[in-house]
Amino acid sequence: MKTSFFCGVSILALTACATQPQSPPLPRAQPSTTQELAAAIDADARRSDHEADAKVRAELAAEAGRDADTCLAREPQAAACLYGGAIALGLEARAHPARAGESLNSMLDKLARAESSDPNYDEAGPARVRALVLIRAPGWPLGPGDTEAGLDAARRAVALRPLYPPNLLALAEGLAKTGDRSGARDAYARARDAAQALPDAADRNDWLREADQGLKH
């Protein structure tokens, strides 16, 4: 799983983005290996990020949840399964806001376990995603949000993968939220430079857009 929680975490409905409604999910071959299950969860998350139809998002969340349960039943300590389970819980939180608090707490638990298992998974994904959840979620008593803890997690991600743009974007967001505008601008600039050094791709363009937006504020 590469970048679905990557730069956006829109699957948390904390910064939900939507394009035009799309058709319901098409039938797909049942994934069987850990790698296939992780890839299937990633595909559901990517689609959910750009899906306006709440019913389709709920179907994608349910599908991702089933794949995550299968993966965890087979390899309960594997970083891919723990991380995939966390992503699936993010989809669940978006699809069912009334249960979001419980889903996000479980998500953070799985991310912590994934980070302990393999902190480098998905370009330091466990720390990066943890950072975004903590930075964007409401704080107690409404949710598990904790900006300072999120900033610490973002710094861990950057320390592991300093040239991966989403890690720098998460750091910039945390710095901005804590009032460090100078530090945030520096991180956004570093994210832009890192993205510009990559081959042209949709993810790269999204990262450049987010960095440029951050530099304008």
Describe the residue ranges of each PLM region.
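TPR alpha-solenoid repeat register
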Residues: 81, 124-126, 167, 201
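Terminal, low-structured helical/coil segments at or just beyond the last alpha-helical repeat
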Residues: 22-27, 177, 185-217
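Helix-turn-helix repeat elements of alpha-solenoid scaffolds
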Residues: 54-69, 100-109, 143-151
